[in-house]
């Protein structure tokens, strides 16, 4: 596995320079674009890393999986009364579909859906940001994971569109807490700093029927795990979920920080990171690396 990971990174490295970092978030525009890392974590606790796999980066929308899992953990099926689990077919920050469907987001991985999930968690936890940080520390086994307040503040300054979604949902009765408070929590979740190994380990319960082996916790039931993985497969990569299924064939979740996590049910979790994005907002080199890894090992679930 180690040799294969090293080879794959060398094969996709020429793609660096052909994408673009997420410069619409000022704090992310400064991230050196020439970084590339990958980590594979097995259900037996073994792992392999290559490249910049231990360099922390901003997880961004990958955090939407953590907040969804938290909400399912304390509220169960009730969360689906407030949002759906269908692909949207619209940009992740679109207001059009949200208006048409009367404030009920299509799924928890578009921004409107993630905001509803944050609203649900805001009602549950006295300190949602700290609860999220501690939850991720537990899942990853890394007690030093932190929130980059510079990134969170940077995103909050440019919050207008997300605020518009929240207020629109509030007008339809689907947002219960103070909008600005929930936005602060939302951007703090996105600003979690983790590396490839942290993320691969933190997501391993999704490859293991909801059981996190290193913490000894049953995070989700087997059925809930299947549900989360299915939404990742259909909606986890913005408008490129179909292309990801075609090329990689695994449930996955990406973020504009350049990270992508993929689940090999029953076996492994993989995280790849390269900051430069393609036109759909997903890591250009990361997509290519996961495609090579999946095809050479035969991991596709299809």
From Swiss-Prot:
- Any matching Pfam family: Glutaminase
Report if keyword Cytoplasm is assigned.
no
Which domain of life does the protein's organism represent?
Answer: Bacteria
Q: Which reaction does it catalyse?
A: L-glutamine + H2O = L-glutamate + NH4(+)
Please list the residues that bind substrate. 61, 111, 155, 162, 186, 238, 256
Which InterPro entries does the annotation name? Answer: Beta-lactam/transpept-like, Glutaminase
* Coiled-coil ranges per UniProt: none
- Alphabetic keyword roster: Hydrolase
- The EC number(s) given in the record are 3.5.1.2
Q: Does the keyword Hydrolase apply?
A: yes
Which processes are annotated in GO (biological process)?
glutamate biosynthetic process; glutamine catabolic process
Which is an annotated GO molecular function term of this record? Answer: glutaminase activity
Broadest EC class assigned to this enzyme: hydrolase
Q: How does it assemble?
A: Homotetramer.
* NCBIfam families tied to this protein: Gln_ase (TIGR03814), PRK00971.1-1 (NF002132), PRK00971.1-2 (NF002133)
What family does the entry list? Belongs to the glutaminase family.
Q: What is this protein called?
A: Glutaminase
> Per the UniProt entry, what species is this protein from, by scientific name?
Pseudomonas putida (strain ATCC 700007 / DSM 6899 / JCM 31910 / BCRC 17059 / LMG 24140 / F1)
